[in-house]
Regions:
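Condensing-enzyme catalytic core mediating Claisen C-C bond formation in acyl metabolism
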Residues: 48-112, 117-120, 154-162, 167-170, ...
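Long, hydrophobic, well-ordered secondary-structure blocks that form the structural core
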Residues: 34-42, 48-49
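Claisen-condensing/thiolase-fold acyl-transfer catalytic domains that form or cleave C-C bonds
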Residues: 2-26, 36, 74, 100-101, ...
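Short, well-ordered, mixed-charge alpha-helical segments that flank or form enzyme active sites
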Residues: 38-43, 88-92, 210-212
């Protein structure tokens, strides 16, 4: 067992590490997994549940969920073909209630570097999925990538934006947490791959590298994002 933590980018991080271990011959089967829990995240990073604090429109709700993928050396299954390890990006966002804005620059940087390194374009993927930028971060990411010359409007989704039904559940800017990209990828997207509805996914799980202490001290929130290409 190797414990990993990259905030909410952990699903992509664990998939990339598992892929590298397999490629290096250090295992035959490796499980990449992560999880999150709403109540645990609320108590640690926000407010006690009993406090009943009001939420602003940019707030996100931590997903209670877990996802796992088994990676092996052979079989008629989707393959991890590329891994792009992200860089920490800090654009000075200090609002812990707007983590989509804090993480978006890291997602944009990783996606841009992935395309630059591989020579690929958004059209090479059926779906480009960021982890938990939510409604706010997704909009920022779309605009920033357009400034780099990449139009992703037709095939870009965000796991945090789509995991809840905001009209019915009133979830503000959407979902977040390590389990957010994990359940959407291991459940929804993987089923689409296995049914051959899609052939390629670029998963870019995103994380806000903050602590309870740093937020209370008014420090900025660095972001991180790792990209993993999963293809048939």
């Amino acid at each position: 067992f190797i414990g990993l933590y990259g905030a909410c980018s952990t699903m992509s991080e664990s998939l990339s590490m598992a892929s590298l271990f397999l490629d290096g011959g250090f295992g035959s089967y490796i499980v990449a997994s992560t999880s999150s829990h709403f109540s645990a995240a609320e108590r640690q990073f926000r407010f006690p549940l009993e406090y009943g604090c009001q939420r602003c429109p940019t707030c996100q709700w931590t997903v209670t969920g877990s996802g796992a993928m088994v990676l092996g050396r052979s079989g008629d299954y989707p393959r991890v073909t590329y891994v792009t390890t992200g860089l920490v990006k800090d654009y000075g966002i200090k609002d812990a209630n707007n983590m989509g804005a804090a993480m978006a620059p890291a997602a944009v940087d990783t996606i841009y570097n992935h395309f630059k390194d591989t020579g690929r374009t958004p059209k090479d993927y059926d779906i480009i999925a960021t982890g938990d930028l939510g409604k706010v971060g997704k909009e920022i990411t779309t605009k920033l990538l357009a400034e780099y010359g990449y139009d992703v409007k037709d095939n870009y989704i965000d796991c945090g934006d789509m995991i809840f039904d905001d009209e019915r559940q009133k979830t503000d800017a959407g979902g977040s947490g390590c389990g957010c990209s994990a359940v959407v990828t291991c459940g929804y997207l993987y089923k689409k791959l296995m049914r051959r509805e899609i052939k390629s996914v670029l998963l870019v799980s995103t994380g806000a590298l903050m602590s309870t202490t740093s937020s209370l001290q008014g420090e900025s929130i660095p972001g991180i994002a790792h990209a993993v290409a999963i293809e048939f």
